[in-house]
């Protein structure tokens, strides 16, 4: 959204990720949802920085997904049955923060249509 003459309006839309139209294969733990600690550590070491999870992850998305139940033992090849929609306002997403995507997604709201499959608690060795 942009503010001009004290009026707020939405700017142009951009597709962030679209698995249905592209491969049809669901994303499994994409970095905008969950990034491993080892990835953050490697980035910080390589770039002499101290970035945290919010450098990669869209804040608020994990919390919102907790309100939806996963479809267990469902074949990934089955057609999508969009389970829900989550809208993450720009101030809760990347806002004006520095991110791995640069400035491309600053001040952008995100709308996620999704289907959750076979969720489980992440094991410590998977981080």
Regions found by a protein language model. Give the residues of each.
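Cross-family detector of peptidyl-prolyl cis-trans isomerase
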Residues: 1-127
